[in-house]
Amino acid sequence: MSKSLKPWALVTGAGGFIGHHLVSYLKANGYRVRGVDIKLPEYSSTDADEFLLLDLRELKNCQTCTARMDLVYHLAADMGGIGYITASHAGIAHNNSLMNLYMLEASRRNDVGRFLFSSSACVYPHGLQTSPDVTPLREEDAFPAQPEEGYGLEKLYAEKLCQYYMEDYSLYTRVVRFHNVYGPLGTYDGGREKAPAAMCRKVACAQSPGGIEVWGDGKQTRSFMYIDDCVEGIHRIMRSDYRNPLNLGTDELVSVDELAEIVIGVSGKKIALMHDLTKPQGVRGRNSDNTRLRSVLHWEPQITLRKGIVPTYSWIAAQTVNATPGAIVAAE
């Protein structure tokens, strides 16, 4: 690391949901932070010491932002909810592959101390996620490989790139597999939002009594992690000595209908669920096995879904005053 008393950390995707929160967390924990994105944060000003507006699909921009950095948290990605990622395979694979390769190469050239890559539970084989009563997914379950098309495949490819850069160039890499992150200051409309944000928006916009549309039959299951747990977990994993991919999520498995009922309960409204079976709903079940996370970090996410939905719903409801309801998307 540099000789500065405070190490420099770069957060890519700092204009996005997780990146914006991570910048604030790192600043609160004594780091100097450079953020980079193609856009500024949408809902709140950044806490970063520096913020660069750069397109990371160009190597020269990746070299610029990684210069003099001790740590790189690479969160930048072309992503969205189930509707977006199932309809945009080529664009997602193209954009993310360029960013991931160029960020690794630039970090190597600039002698970055450690590089953390944000992967996804979408790397896990579809065949292990065919039942709502899914067995929690272990890190080793990613192989033999059968990831989700597009987004999941490029994430798994980037995980291997991280491994190769560590083996061949001694770039110390860390890989985090996120499981459905939610919270305030995240995208809640436009098609790129995840299920908790979309559900909060729909309920907030609905009349009481009234109804909301849910994609699929509502029986598909997921676990959801609150943003505060997410950024703490990212920081802990970066500081750890563990070099292989790690799940980062809760193991509190709920159905999409149960998620809806939690949001409705927090809202205090009387709302019925109407299911649209023609819409994409993703895999039938997905849950995080946190056995290795607990073993490595002696820690795991602590915030329950209901506790996290309270501030999330409150924030989204405040954003959607006079808004028109849209469709609920399925979970990732």
What are the functions of these language-model segments?
Residues 1-184, 311, 319, 330-332:
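N-terminal Rossmann-like NAD(P)+-binding domain of SDR-like oxidoreductases, especially those catalyzing
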Residues 103, 162, 199, 293-294:
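Structural element of the ATP-grasp superfamily
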Residues 45-48, 127-131, 186-190, 227, ...:
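Short aromatic-enriched loop/helix-cap "lid" or pocket-rim segments at secondary-structure transitions
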Residues 19, 100, 178, 196, ...:
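Alpha-helical structural signal
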Residues 157, 161, 165, 195-199, ...:
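Hydrophobic alpha-helix immediately C-terminal to the catalytic Tyr-X-X-X-Lys motif of short-chain
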Residues 12, 93-97, 151-152, 189, ...:
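Short, solvent-exposed loop/helix junctions and linker helices
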Residues 205-332:
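C-terminal substrate-binding subdomain of Rossmann-fold SDR/epimerase-dehydratase oxidoreductases
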